A protein has these predicted regions:
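FAD-site-proximal beta/loop scaffold in flavoenzymes
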Residues: 5, 10, 15-32, 125-172, ...
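Active-site acidic short loop of glycosyltransferases
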Residues: 35, 118-119, 157
């Protein structure tokens, strides 16, 4: 299992507050922040999705795509900009995550610098697939390193199957488990065909 790793902000407070207000998954940890004030840091589609999802339960969601902004104009941004529970903070990067026992604030630098009081920070930066050796072996990947598979979970190399986060699909344990089961069945079928 190669999976993926997440890019981090690498700012003071990030490691200290992991699990105490710093999260890397809105789907996983969002329910803990019902009626709280949170920030979603990231400019990709997954970050936009988490802003949308968290706005349904959190009291306030600060969307902080970073100084570079969003990687593209995602369709969801149109109605999220009209959502009174969502506030976009552009032109700023998170410089520090702080608090005492739990996250209490982030410090921003850039055109919108200052301190923002909140209860949680969702760091939703791009995933970095850890399947580099497979790419070197000729397995087809996209520009981000995600492994391409067909509907049977087979890669471009006959008899080599991939499933889960390394394919960058779903990014949830339950999805990976289902894909793994499908890949295992396909692999068994392939082995039987060799007899």
């Amino acid at each position: 299992a190669t999976g993926v790793s997440r890019k981090t902000l690498s700012v003071p407070g990030e490691n200290e507050f992991k699990g105490r207000g710093v999260s890397y998954c809105g789907v996983c940890d969002g329910p803990f922040f019902r009626d709280k004030m949170v920030a979603v840091v990231g400019g990709g589609h997954e970050a936009v999705h988490d802003v949308e999802m968290l706005s349904e339960t959190a009291d306030k969601v600060y969307a902080i795509p970073g100084k570079k902004g969003y990687s593209e104009e995602f369709p969801e941004l149109t109605y999220l900009r009209e959502n009174p529970k969502v506030e976009f903070i552009t032109g700023a990067d998170v410089k520090e995550i702080g608090g005492s026992e739990f996250v209490e604030y982030v410090t921003l630098e850039g055109s919108n610098k200052g301190r923002l009081s909140l209860d949680g920070v969702f760091i939703i930066l791009e995933h970095v697939p850890t399947a580099g050796i497979l790419g070197e072996a000729g397995v087809s990947t996209d520009e981000g390193g995600c492994i391409f598979v067909d509907r049977d979970m087979e890669t471009n190399i006959k008899g080599l199957f991939a499933a889960g986060d390394c394919t960058c699909e779903g990014m949830q344990i339950v999805t990976a488990a289902g894909m793994g089961a499908k890949a295992a069945l396909s692999a068994m079928k392939h082995v039987k065909s060799l007899r």
